[in-house]
């Protein structure tokens, strides 16, 4: 279910990004969040947080069967941790007294680096040509 849902969300994301009117809409973030949430669930199945007993056996068997290599992007905890710790980032933004929040799709990293500054919290940014999702310092 999570793999299929991640694939559907990713297809929707690509469609929205190719549409000039939708590219900066909230819909992009809805489907990106859906994709990341489902990908995080797949990651947890493949690489449990506390791999003990049945969880460890399941993760090992699934990674072997699906030929998921060590270092695969799906095993990274960065994206799933990012989703799960939004409350901590909001607390940091408030404490720093930030005056703006950056939430945008950029065609490339140069555009992002041009507009990003210390007084803006990076809520969520997508760098389209790399398909890289950035939130705060991640």
Annotated model-derived regions:
Residues 1-72, 101-138:
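Amphipathic alpha-helical interface segments
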């Amino acid at each position: 279910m999570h793999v299929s849902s991640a694939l559907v969300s990713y297809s929707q994301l690509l469609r929205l990004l190719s549409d000039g009117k939708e590219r900066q809409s909230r819909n992009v973030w809805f489907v990106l969040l859906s994709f990341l949430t489902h990908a995080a669930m797949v990651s947890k199945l493949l690489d449990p947080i506390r791999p003990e007993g049945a969880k460890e056996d399941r993760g090992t068997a699934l990674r072997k069967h699906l030929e998921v290599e060590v270092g695969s992007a799906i095993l990274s905890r960065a994206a799933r941790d990012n989703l799960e710790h939004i409350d901590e980032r909001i607390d940091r933004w408030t404490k720093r007294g930030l005056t703006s929040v950056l939430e945008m799709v950029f065609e490339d990293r140069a555009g992002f680096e041009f507009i990003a500054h210390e007084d803006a919290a990076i809520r969520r940014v997508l760098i389209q040509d790399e398909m890289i999702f950035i939130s705060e310092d991640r």
